[in-house]
Amino acid sequence: MERSRWRRQLSTRWDERRLEAYLRYADAIKRFTSVAGRLAAGKGLFDLPQPLAQDVGLERLADAELERGYAFEAVLLMGDAETISAARALQRHAWVLEQFVRDMRSGTAQDWTQAFRQFQEKRDEYYIAARKSLGVHAAFRLRAEDPVILGQDPRQL
């Protein structure tokens, strides 16, 4: 009896740690791509109200990349295979955005938008994998299927 209770408690603790790792990575990748988006706005590739100048932005991007890397290590340690693969795909698509703002990849605003949408799709896939790993059964709607996103943007009315 004691042994089964101990195992349940241990499983609960690992689930909590896994949740923390997944959330930390999601937050770190969001910070990274937010800085990249603001840098892209400063280059005229993206329409955001708070563009960042290259000198300040690249330093912030480097800091965000360090944090993203640290957070990824926790996903590697605590995550299941599917979530780890989804996190790797997500980071690769985030790096594409970084290449645009570091002038390592040329392109137009349309190219940036396409790369950003691909990143968003990979982010959705990461969330789906993380939710499955954590046993979250509530429905999750992909951006590509969400009627709110597919409808007209009220900012453009």
What are these regions (language model features)?
Residues 1-157:
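Conserved non-transmembrane functional hotspots
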